[in-house]
């Protein structure tokens, strides 16, 4: 983990732990739970780890000071072309905005003018984090999202206009697992014609829920409102039937929606115009991309599953990372 206790002492991704405090954990019958018990301990205590690293003949021993492991939102940020940067966000947490600003500053120093924001597989997170991220792209007083319910009053959230990336070209990558807070950001970008959305229709999760504590210590979440994009599209997909709702992604696959753009049909009642360019976009749940990219069906073949099961792909990845590290 970046900036975690192990990284601070020099342990690298791909290193294999073979012993904890002189007790072997490799080549012996030991459950994952038992291994984790040996690795974990009070904050500030120390643990000795014996590591095997590819390309190094002798085992390496590191003394790690146990500490809180940071949970980061950014998986990657780098330049893919001389003027184009790439940032991947895996979740919207308390530090997302700070991490994004730091990555943006670093990329802009490298000459970034355009940005690809990858929200594929991002299941959402904190509303405030989504608003802060959308604020980086939108102008002052531009609506980011609003909530409204049958009895809940409309609540609106606007951009402050002080973002660090309000003019460069922007592409947002989404897929069928892009949900909630991610859809708030991508919906705002699309409705204001700030950038283009590329990929497949997002999940369609946009409910506002109020937690209610019960006397026995349990809790229920009561849905009181829904999220709407600036143009008035409801992010939440229909959930009249729990069976249909739970099988939605399977049905998308079976109907060809994940492979062919022309298999997706919307009634005229779901057509909405964007705020500036008056382009036609669609409601009905989820964010429909401007440019469709079919799903990579290679992931579902027996051949691919066999490679994954035998560890071939992870071994190749580790070898590639090591070679790149030596070259740099």
Region spans (language model):
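Structural motif
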Residues: 14-16
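Cleft-lining beta-strand/loop regions that shape enzyme active-site pockets
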Residues: 1-12, 21-24, 28-216
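Polar, glycine-rich mid-to-C-terminal structural blocks
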Residues: 181, 193, 200, 204-272
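Conserved functional hotspot residues or short segments at active or partner-binding sites
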Residues: 234-326
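A sequence-level detector of short linear motifs
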Residues: 26, 61, 221, 236, ...
């Amino acid at each position: 983990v970046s900036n975690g206790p192990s990284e601070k002492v020099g342990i690298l991704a791909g290193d294999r732990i073979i012993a904890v405090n002189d007790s072997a954990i490799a080549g012996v019958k030991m459950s994952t739970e038992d291994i984790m018990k040996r690795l974990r301990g009070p904050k500030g205590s120390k643990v000795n780890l014996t590591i095997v690293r590819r390309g190094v003949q002798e085992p390496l021993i590191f003394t790690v000071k146990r500490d809180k492991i940071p949970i980061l939102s950014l998986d990657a940020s780098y330049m893919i072309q001389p003027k184009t940067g790439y940032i991947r966000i895996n979740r919207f947490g308390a530090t997302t905005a700070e991490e994004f600003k730091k990555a943006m500053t670093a990329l802009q120093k490298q000459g970034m003018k355009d940005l690809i924001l990858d929200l594929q597989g991002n299941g959402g997170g904190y509303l405030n984090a989504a608003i802060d991220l959308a604020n980086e792209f939108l102008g002052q007083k531009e609506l980011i999202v609003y909530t409204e319910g049958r009895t809940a009053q409309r609540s609106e959230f606007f951009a402050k206009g002080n973002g660090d990336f309000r003019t460069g070209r922007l592409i947002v990558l989404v897929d069928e697992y892009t949900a909630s807070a991610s859809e708030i950001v991508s919906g705002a970008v699309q409705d204001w014609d700030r950038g283009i959305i590329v990929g497949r229709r997002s999940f369609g999760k946009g409910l506002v829920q109020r937690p209610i504590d019960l006397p026995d210590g349990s809790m229920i979440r009561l849905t009181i409102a829904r999220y709407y994009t600036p143009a008035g599209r409801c992010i939440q997909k229909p959930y009249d039937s729990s069976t249909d709702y739970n099988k939605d992604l399977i049905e998308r696959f079976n109907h060809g929606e994940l492979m062919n753009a022309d298999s997706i049909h919307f009634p005229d009642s779901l057509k909405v115009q964007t705020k500036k360019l008056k382009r036609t976009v669609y409601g009905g749940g989820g964010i429909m991309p401007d440019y469709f990219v079919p799903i990579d069906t290679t992931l579902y073949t027996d051949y691919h599953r066999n490679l994954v099961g035998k560890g071939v792909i992870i071994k190749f990845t580790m070898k590639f990372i090591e070679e790149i590290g030596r070259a740099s």
